[in-house]
Amino acid sequence: MLHQDDEKEKFIFDIFNPMELDDVITTHKKVTALGKEAECKKLRNALIILDDVADDPRIARNEKQIHELYFRGRHHKLSVLISAQRYRSIAPQIRTQCTALFVFRLRSHLELEAVLEEVSATYDKKTIAGFYREATEEPYSFLYIRLEAKKPEDIFWERFEYRLLP
């Protein structure tokens, strides 16, 4: 069993630093490789949270690194959660790799249109807009969209609690 000493190993970073992110990714790849070599039944997962960074110029300069996380991270048991004030500020290549969306009340109709456009393969935009209004009606509530759901009725949720159906 591999253990982490939280006193010695930094795991929360207040400022985006591509070199520190590289260190985290490299370390986790090594941990995953060791687990595979030892034939561990359960490999360790890691979650990287990029909070409100979509407009951060350091992210734009290191877009390749972020794309790599989204495209290859799952092979190394790395998950990524990115939060943004504007949906469209997240690169389309990253949005297509997402497995879920959490859509809180949006400030712009253009942002809502962008979300509706990208998730309207199963239901029409009007239906999904209704789901959005219902899910975000209460303060702090959100529309949870399971992009990898196998059945249409499992895609749209109000928070994690109520399935939304037409």
Q: What function would you assign to each model-found segment?
A:
Residues 2-130:
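Conserved P-loop NTPase motor cores
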Residues 39, 62, 111-166:
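P-loop NTPase motor core of the ASCE superfamily
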